[in-house]
Amino acid sequence: MSTERGKTTIADTVVAKIAGLATREVAGVHALGGSATRAVGALRDRIPGASVNHAQGVSVEVGEKQAAVDVDIVAEYGVSINDLAGGIRRNVIAALERMTGLEVVEVNITVHDVYLADDDSDDGRTSDDLRVV
């Protein structure tokens, strides 16, 4: 963005980080990224002193005055995916336009998985215990 007083350049990583944070704010988003991205993120989180990657699952294309965003998410089970996608779009567009002044031309959302609360529970049963005979 250029003015008579100088030029402001916003790095793609800044735009991606803002989009990632705005996506996480929406109720119904369990995680960002596909399974491989989340696996790498989980490994990074275990390294002492490693910083959280707020742009995980987000890719952007940034021009002089416009930006396009792609977001990969895991939705919580029971949430309307259409409503969730609409909420993500609204929040990402509002955050980016307010914070950067860029016009957001599109926010594409890919839902890679649905999170079930039971996926994290470990009640001690084995797969043999869960078989129907």
Which residue ranges define each predicted feature?
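Short, charged, intrinsically disordered terminal tails
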Residues: M1, Y115-V133
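A short interface-forming secondary-structure element
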Residues: E64-G86
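Short loop/turn motifs enriched for small/polar and acidic residues
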Residues: V74-E76, I109-V114
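Short beta-strand elements
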Residues: H30-G34, E103-T110
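Short edge beta-strands and adjacent turn/loop segments
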Residues: A36-A39, D45-D72, L116
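N-terminal, polar/charged subdomain of small-to-medium soluble alpha/beta proteins
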Residues: M1-V40, R44, N53, L116
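Short, non-transmembrane amphipathic alpha-helical segments
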Residues: I81-T100, V104
